[in-house]
From Swiss-Prot:
Keywords: Ribonucleoprotein, Ribosomal protein, RNA-binding, rRNA-binding. Residues 125-137 have a biased composition (Acidic residues). It comes from Shewanella halifaxensis (strain HAW-EB4). This is Small ribosomal subunit protein bS6. Residues 104-124 have a biased composition (Basic and acidic residues). Gene3D superfamilies: 3.30.70.60. Residues 96-137 are annotated as: Disordered. GO terms for cellular component: cytosolic small ribosomal subunit.
Length: 137
């Protein structure tokens, strides 16, 4: 079996259907005896150039180890699904299991946002406590 990196872009109006699509496509690969090494749902992102007058798309990345027949079947499924705007399948030399730079950047943003949200809440809680102490005196 060979290692592949697969990226596909889904129409932004079909974003709710992406989990089902991922399940269906990973099922195609695993039924052929394949293994999913990495699965990343990057969500809606800006496109580098418009595709069918669309400026955003839902991105999904897969790193898999499977047979060439399963990859051909997956590419056929991409072709017949109108919601899939673009897809790319690249053969790689080894399995890639570490998080991609896109996923790392998203995780960093999420941790920054959550820490920024906690800080104002903590300050507001302190102010409420101080005002409660002042009114109690």
């Amino acid at each position: 079996m060979r290692h592949y990196e697969i990226v596909f872009l889904v129409h932004p109006d079909q974003s709710e259907q992406v989990p089902g699509m991922i399940e269906r496509y990973t099922g195609i690969l695993t039924q052929a005896g394949g293994q999913i090494h990495r699965l990343e749902d990057w969500g809606r992102r800006q496109l580098a150039y418009p595709i069918i007058e669309l400026h955003k798309a839902h991105y999904v990345l897969l790193n898999v180890e499977t047979t060439a027949e399963a990859v051909e079947e997956l590419e056929t499924a991409f072709r017949f699904n109108d919601a899939v705007l673009r897809s790319m399948v690249m053969r790689t030399k080894a399995a890639i299991t570490e998080a991609s730079p896109m996923a790392k950047a998203k995780d960093e943003r999420d941790t920054r946002r959550s820490s920024e949200e906690r800080a104002p809440r903590a300050e507001a809680a302190e102010e409420v406590e101080e005002s409660a102490e002042n009114t109690a005196e």
